[in-house]
UniProtKB/Swiss-Prot annotation:
Its EC number is 2.7.1.167, 2.7.7.70. It catalyses: D-glycero-beta-D-manno-heptose 7-phosphate + ATP = D-glycero-beta-D-manno-heptose 1,7-bisphosphate + ADP + H(+); D-glycero-beta-D-manno-heptose 1-phosphate + ATP + H(+) = ADP-D-glycero-beta-D-manno-heptose + diphosphate. It comes from the Bacteria. The active site is at 263. The lineage of its organism: Bacteria, Pseudomonadati, Pseudomonadota, Gammaproteobacteria, Pseudomonadales. GO terms for molecular function: ATP binding; heptose 7-phosphate kinase activity; heptose-1-phosphate adenylyltransferase activity; phosphotransferase activity, alcohol group as acceptor. The gene is hldE. This is Bifunctional protein HldE. In the N-terminal section; belongs to the carbohydrate kinase PfkB family. In the C-terminal section; belongs to the cytidylyltransferase family. It comes from Pseudomonas aeruginosa (strain UCBPP-PA14).
Amino acid sequence: MKLSMPRFDQAPVLVVGDVMLDRYWHGATSRISPEAPVPVVRVEQHEDRPGGAANVALNIAALGAQALLVGVTGRDEAADSLANSLKAAGVDARFQRIDSQPTIVKLRVMSRHQQLLRVDFEEPFRTDAAALAVDVESLLAKVKVLVLSDYGKGALQNHQVLIQAARARNIPVLADPKGKDFAIYRGASLITPNLSEFETIVGRCADEAELVAKGQELMSELDLGALLVTRGEHGMTLLRHGQPALHLPARAREVFDVTGAGDTVISTLAAALAAGEELPSAVGLANLAAGIVVGKLGTAAISAPELRRAVQREQGSERGVLGLEQLLLAIEDARAHGEKIVFTNGCFDILHAGHVTYLEQARAQGDRLIVGVNDDASVTRLKGVGRPINSVDRRMAVLAGLGAVDWVVSFAEDTPERLLEQVRPDVLVKGGDYGVEQVVGAQIVKAYGGEVRVLGLVENSSTTAIVEKIRQKG
C-alpha cells in the first residue's frame, strides 16, 4: 500500500469522551520495605500527561491537525493540570466540571522504566448528558470528523444522540468502544475494538476467516460503516461492506509500553480522514503510528515528523526508485536486519545484456544493491551532445524493473562521491579492467572500513557502440 503524508493542517476533529490524567512518579529502588515484602521507591521525578480522550485529542494536535475536545472533569488540581497541558499542546478543550466528583487520575509508580504499581483515583461520572450533547452539537459545524473515546467512565451516556447529530451533517463518527454492549454505537462510521473487546461481543475466533465472518455479521447488525479490529502483534484487520478484508501486519520495531496505543490508532485515523484520506490509507497511517507509539514509555503522542519518517521508511522498504531521504531510511532498516549494502553507479543510457549480467554479479556481493544513476545534465557532460538517449526517469524505471536491483537513486554530479559519503555502502562495486585504487570513491569507502571490488565486464557490450551502430544505420 502506497502511503503519503496528508495535509493535517486542514483537518479539524472533535473528540468527545472520558478524559483522565495519567500521572507518573519515577524513582530509584534499592531496598525492600521492612513493613511488607515490597520495594521502596524514592521518588525523584513526577510528570502529568493527558490520558483517555484527552490523549486522543493530544495525538491529533501533535500531528498538526485542529483538535477540539469535550469531556467531564472534577473541579480540582488534576483538572487544572489537564487543562494547562492541553492548552500548551494546542487543544481547544471544553470541560464540563463537576464540583462533587474528582477528575479521573491514573497514578503509575515507575522505576528503571518498569511499572511497579498503578493506583486509580476515580468514580463513574454522573453527567448532564443533555448539556454535553448541546456542547457537541454546537461544535459539529466546525469539524470534519467526530471521535467518541469511550472508556466507560460515564462521560458518554447517550451515544445515539451524538451519532445521529453527526450523521445528519454527513460527519463521519469513529468510536473506540468499551463494554459488553456495542449496540450503543449503532450507526457509527467506524469502530475500533481491540481483539479482546471484539471477542467479548462476538465470541472467540479460531482463525482469521472466523474473525472476518463474525465482523461482517456485527457490521450488518449494528449498521456500521466499517470495523477495524486491532490485534496487537498480529497487526490490524479492516472490514468494509462489499470489500475483501484488509489485513495489515504490525509495524513495531521494539515494544516498550502499549499504554495509549488504541488512542494513537483512532486519533491518526480521525486526523487522516479529516484531511481527506481514503479509509484504507488512513488505516495504513494509523498502523504505522501505533508501531511508533508502542516503542515509547507511557502514554505518549507521536508528532507529524515521526509519522512522516515512518511513511518514508515504509516507502523505502519497497524496491524501486527512491529519493535520497527515502533511500537513507531504507538503508537504516536494512542494516538493522543485518543486511550488507552494495553500491554501483553509471549512466545506463541504453540497457543491454552486459549491464544485466554485471548488475546480477554486483548484487551477489551482498544483500541489497543500490544503483546510482547520473542525471541527464551529467551524462551530457560525460558523453557529449546527443546523450543521453533516454531521460533519467526512463533509465531509472528500467533499472528498477530488474530483479537484481533493490533501489535506484539519481545524482547530479559527474561522479558519485558525494552520494557515497551519505550512503556509506558496505561494498562499492565497479566494472572494468583497472585496479581498485582507480575506482572513483574508493578512498571514501575504504576510509570507513568498506570494501571496493572490481568486476569484469561482458565483452562486446557497450552503450556507446550500440548508439554508434544505430547512427550508422540511420
